[in-house]
């Protein structure tokens, strides 16, 4: 198994993914009851994930010598576990099944545009903070 040959990377991805998934789950528990048509927990996870991905990429670019294992922990692991394209897809399918086309369009637009905007903000904020 290739992953066994690189145990630190394997463990970093797994640990990061567990932490990210736990945060996503907690956001769902906290925010999904607020508005039942569009689950805010998934939206919050995707927007926060976009923001943190932008900041992480800026950090990675600012520190070329950063450990590849730390990069994997942050991006593939934690942010991969936090962000929720499969959950987003399932929630979109539920809107389709209920014929809620307007909510579906809003759901998709806010997740995609919002995540891209948050990634840009995260990158810009880290770059400005770093100077």
Curated annotation (Swiss-Prot):
UniProt main location, coarse: membrane
Q: Which domain of life is it from?
A: Bacteria
Write out the entry's keywords from A to Z: Cell inner membrane, Cell membrane, Ion channel, Ion transport, Membrane, Metal-binding, Sodium, Transmembrane, Transmembrane helix, Transport
Reaction catalysed by this chain?
fluoride(in) = fluoride(out)
> Does Membrane show up as a keyword for this record?
yes
Activity regulation info: Na(+) is not transported, but it plays an essential structural role and its presence is essential for fluoride channel function.
Picking any one GO biological process from the record gives: cellular detoxification of fluoride
MF-aspect GO terms: fluoride channel activity; metal ion binding
Q: Name one GO cellular component term.
A: plasma membrane
Question: Which family would the database say this protein is a member of?
Answer: Belongs to the fluoride channel Fluc/FEX (TC 1.A.43) family.
What is the name of this protein? Fluoride-specific ion channel FluC
State the organism's lineage. Bacteria, Pseudomonadati, Pseudomonadota, Betaproteobacteria, Rhodocyclales
User: What gene does the UniProt entry assign to this protein?
Assistant: fluC
């Amino acid at each position: 198994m290739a992953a066994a040959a690189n145990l630190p990377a394997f463990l970093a991805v797994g640990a990061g993914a567990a932490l990210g998934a736990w945060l996503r789950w907690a956001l769902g528990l906290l925010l999904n009851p607020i508005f039942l048509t569009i689950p805010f927990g998934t939206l919050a996870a995707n927007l926060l994930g976009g923001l943190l991905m932008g900041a992480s990429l800026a950090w990675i670019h600012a520190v070329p010598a950063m450990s590849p294992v730390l990069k994997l922990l942050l991006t593939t692991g934690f942010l991969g576990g936090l962000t929720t394209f499969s959950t987003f897809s399932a929630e979109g399918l539920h809107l389709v099944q209920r014929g809620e086309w307007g909510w579906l369009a809003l759901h998709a637009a806010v997740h995609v545009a919002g995540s891209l905007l948050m990634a840009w903000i995260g990158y810009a904020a880290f770059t400005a903070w770093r100077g």
